Amino acid sequence: MALDSTPWFVGGGAQHSPEVARALAYAATTGAEGVSGIGDLKVQAQAVPNGTVRVLPGAGLLLNRYAGGTGQTYSLRNATQTDLAVTATGSGGGRTDLVVARVLDPQYEGTAPADPTTFQYSRVEIIEGVPAATKTAKELNLSYPAIALARITLPASTATVTASMITDLRRVAQPRRERAMMTVFPSSTLSMPTAGYSSWPLTTATRPAVSVPIWATKVDIVAHVTGVKFTKVSAVDTVAGIRTGFGSSLPAENSILIQDAEDSGGRYNYTWVGTHTVTEAMRGTDQVVNIQAVRSSGTGLWVADYQTSIVLDWEFSEGAQ
């Protein structure tokens, strides 16, 4: 196969092909596909549910799935909210529909538009009657570029689309990640709480406040705590609950620690692991990374002191929301 005669970008009046431009988009985005931002092209029921759904503004990247289009990417944008009519179901049964963003390219479709300046080359539309478990447009083996935005599951005899019928299928094309780590050393001897969850072996003074990226939707927290002193007091198991915290997000429990009755006292290492949703209100603010514990049964004693180290590792990530 010969090279395209004109690379991107040559001056002097050279004619540039759409294939080379799409190849540039593919290379620049490493072949990624999906929506551009966390809220882009989200499909929602109307504020007052009716027989339509709304597709919010946003942008997306679509791989060229026309025959001969390998290694090319389209970029589309929905500038304003778009409403789509959903066909009502009859009494004979329900139906599953797929809302997609797609490209219609006359170069491959074979029919030139009557007016190329007003033709709608990109559009959002509904594909009716797809398999109930459909998650991507690729599963349908379409012969054109498309990405799945949402699945609508309609019961029989339904003309009104509610939020509970819509499953969000969007994926961010190039999700961002940001990771950081720090080590904390206790400045005093700290016994594990026994009256309820509290920061341990961190304290109010040593919990780090971290800057939350404006694009983050999730944070994963891992804490490795080494050199914790355990003192065996009686011949029964000692159990503790542990959990990670992020801002005001404190789950009931992430895990437990158990020192069996057969264990001897000494220094032990433990790990906290947790995942937290980053809410819209948290983005662009400083939030505290925290780990907590409480002894829930038994009489053994866990103590952090000058021989203890706490390695905190957190990673923000981005996903459609």
Name each model-derived stretch.
Residues A79, G92-G94, I214-A216, R267, ...:
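Surface-exposed coil/turn segments at beta-strand junctions on protein surfaces, enriched
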Residues S143-I147, S157-T160, F185-A205, D263-N269, ...:
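Solvent-exposed, conformationally flexible loop/turn segments
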Residues L169-V236, V311-Q321:
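Terminal (often C-terminal
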